[in-house]
Amino acid sequence: MHPTHASAPLPAPDRVHIYDVLRGLAIFGTFAVNIWVFAVSDYVTAAFDTALTQGVLDPVSRFMHAAQAFLLSGKFLAMLAIVFGMGMQLLYQRALARGEAWPAGHHRRALALLLIGAVHFVFVFQADVLMTYAVVALIAAPLLARPPGVQRTWFLIALALHVLLALAVAVYNAQYYAAGPAPQPQDDPALAGFVTEPGPWGYLDDLQWRLQHVLHFRAEAIGIIPGTLALVLVGAWLVRTGVLLTPSANPALRERLFRLGLQIGLPSSALLFLP
């Protein structure tokens, strides 16, 4: 993230078309990545993971799995966080243009999103991410009014925390899977009652199940806060530089970002094809 001058208010409240397009792509892509959660049982998922890790799948199936991961894995979720940051920066600039207080007004939005996310988690789906975005918004909103150097420092801290957490999870998973065969759903204490207890399982049982294991199901939502914050700050930076919103702004920076994606992003994603 390079230093930039203070944010200037948006000249007009017109729709930002590139922002709308990116937001639509991010939402559609995230839906495409996560739709299997609603269509595949834990038993099928565990069986597929076991076949994948133990080399049971044929070469074509393994290639298709790697190609799908190459195109989808993490990319739309990252885009969604970046677009969220772009939206926050646009709201901040419009608040400046109108002389409105910041971040007081946005904090009310974030608290409302946190409440909606909590309701969604309890009554609908245990993998809710709205609460994560609400917490990130509460952290990022005051940062948008700070100098670019302060935002860059927070970006680096958040990125470092994200990398450390990712490495810790990777090491833990490697040791866990090396200790024996792939775990089955009934081996997970949070899933044990769900998949092994006899008798009907109703909606009220589902609510109780989520509340009893709230820390288990919220661990990922908490763990992705640093990485999401870093991407949100990237989105805000993209708006400030004008690299996406103004075609003629900063062509050199746009070219550097394009090369960065080709030289680092593309090869790192291609590692998914390795056995």
Cite the ranges covered by each PLM segment.
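Solvent-exposed interhelical
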Residues: P103, I139-W154, W237-L260
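N-terminal signal-anchor module of multipass membrane proteins
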Residues: H2-F84, L91
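Internal alpha-helical transmembrane segments
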Residues: L90, R94, E100-V169
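Long hydrophobic alpha-helical segments that form multi-pass transmembrane helix bundles
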Residues: I157-A236
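Hydrophobic alpha-helical transmembrane segments of integral membrane proteins
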Residues: H17-L22, I27, L71-G74, A78-I82, ...
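Specific transmembrane alpha-helix
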Residues: A78-Q93, M131-L144, G223-T246
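C-terminal TM-helix exit segments that contain a strictly Trp-centered aromatic cap at the helix terminus
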Residues: V33-V37, L164-Y176, P267-L274
